[in-house]
Amino acid sequence: MSEVKYKRVIMKLSGEALAGDKGTGINPPVIQKVAEELRDVHDLGVQIAIVVGGGNMWRGETGEQLGMERVQADYIGMLGTVMNALALQDSLESLGVPTRVQTSIEMRQIAEPYIRRKAVRHLEKNRIVIFAAGTGSPYFSTDTTSALRAAEIGAEAILMAKNGVDGIYSADPNVDPDAVKFDELTHMDIIDKGLNVMDTTASSLSMENNIPLVVFNLNQAGNIKKVVAGENIGTTVRGEE
């Protein structure tokens, strides 16, 4: 293995990132590019697990507009993550990268059920594991899923790949020209400052388990490899003070 800082990681990949400029659905060139970047990191010997979001397939606001119960809307969102997971699996396997999808809601015809020990074994065999369907329970975000799965599988870091955003800012840089980028924070800083990075549950889980978070721009070629190598890009959120 080439010298890397993180040897087992969870990458949080939003659904919006897979949509690219289209905004919704899956953008074929984008998902192929993501798969190629992941292959390059996999070739370094890094054990990679991925948590996919579903915002390109379903938004909670749509459920609200329909007068839908939150629980029902959340389940639809979980199914959206499964579609993204299967598409990403296919893109990775087309590049020769062995990949397994595990879902928190059982659907054995298309994916394995989530079993922690089996997921770890896949990683040890140098297979990429994609976690879909969130935690399997409503009211929990895929950010929380990332923190939970990272703790369960012993990931050394959570890589939060953002669509066109190169780190954490004091405000939305697209709206506020005075927004300041942070190079380093703690999870408590995120909670105290109310920064819109991940929800409080996810931040608390990461803090309690001392799991660092790296927020970086997915659209910049080679950034995933730079993060696992320990280069200072984006914003690093430390697991403890």
UniProtKB/Swiss-Prot annotation:
Among SUPFAM superfamilies, the record links this protein to: Carbamate kinase-like
Q: Which CDD domains match?
A: AAK_UMPK-PyrH-Ec
The UniProt annotation places UMP binding at G54, D74, T135, G136, S137, P138, Y139, F140, S141, T142
Instruction: Indicate how activity is controlled.
Output: Allosterically activated by GTP. Inhibited by UTP.
Record region (Involved in allosteric activation by GTP): 20-25
Instruction: Kindly state which reaction or reactions the protein catalyses.
Output: UMP + ATP = UDP + ADP
UniProt keyword Kinase, yes or no? yes
Name of the molecule in the record:
Uridylate kinase
Gene source species: Pediococcus pentosaceus (strain ATCC 25745 / CCUG 21536 / LMG 10740 / 183-1w)
